[in-house]
UniProtKB/Swiss-Prot annotation:
Alphabetical keyword list: Amino-acid biosynthesis, Aromatic amino acid biosynthesis, Lyase
Gene Ontology terms for molecular function: 3-dehydroquinate dehydratase activity
SUPFAM superfamilies named in the record: Type II 3-dehydroquinate dehydratase
The organism of origin for this protein: Kineococcus radiotolerans (strain ATCC BAA-149 / DSM 14245 / SRS30216)
Protein name in the entry: 3-dehydroquinate dehydratase
Length: 146
């Protein structure tokens, strides 16, 4: 089974953009680690990143149609996109919302998520290890049949 790991705007700059907030690990580093983890768990992961909201919506629609579980770091769209929330509501195989930083300890506007109410779970503030936790959780549901 495949788990999609989808990343929103500015995450292509992970490791370079505000390393004091997001750390020094790049998205390529995260992908390499998740590929190893997926092999251990007996699942496949596919990591994608886009700064274009319409592209993200298309990926989520495709995942919903294919019945795939999704790890999503919506980044700034977390706080702004009803369209993203509505697309995510169609995901039936599981959705874990991930944030590298603790969005609840930052500016007020970052504390609201349009995605959280339709997510299976949320991981925030654990750095890039949040991706690992999300993949482990979804793999357990897939392999365990939950």
């Amino acid at each position: 089974m495949k788990i999609l790991v989808l990343n929103g705007p500015n995450l292509g700059r992970l490791g370079r953009r505000q390393p004091e907030v997001y750390g020094s690990e790049t998205l390529a580093d995260v992908e390499a680690r998740l590929q190893r983890l997926a092999g251990e768990l007996g699942v496949e992961v596919e990591l994608r990143q886009t700064d274009a909201e319409h592209e993200m919506l298309g990926w989520i629609h495709d995942a919903a149609d294919a019945g795939l579980p999704v790890v999503l770091n919506p980044a700034a769209w977390t706080h702004t996109s009803v369209a993203l929330r509505d697309a995510c509501a169609e995901l039936s195989a599981g959705l874990v919302e991930v944030h590298v930083s603790n969005v609840h300890a930052r500016e007020d506007f970052r504390r609201h998520s349009f995605v959280s109410p339709v997510a299976t779970g949320v991981v925030a503030g654990l750095g890039t290890a949040g991706y690992d936790l999300a993949v482990r959780f979804l793999a357990g549901r897939v392999v365990g049949g939950a």
